[in-house]
């Protein structure tokens, strides 16, 4: 069994795409509308794990997804921190280095979902 994707219901597709596609760097694998009310975007590599963004005009989503955190690995934590700051995204916590081989920080996505950015050495 393989993990395929995680689904995030978003309040603003444009803001979420800017965050996950432009800033985090996930590729748009697929994008389509479902009727007049919904839009779905699959982000990630063709054969890899994906992030599915779903926007529904009629759906009220909570201001924050409690107890959910998504992690992304980067080659340089310093560059990732600069990228966040240059895009006016506040560093919520960190950088943290519990052991010498790993360091990370946390930000929130546009809907308040906690996103961990990690560098493994």
Where are these regions (language model features)?
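Vicinal oxygen chelate
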Residues: 31, 42, 81-121
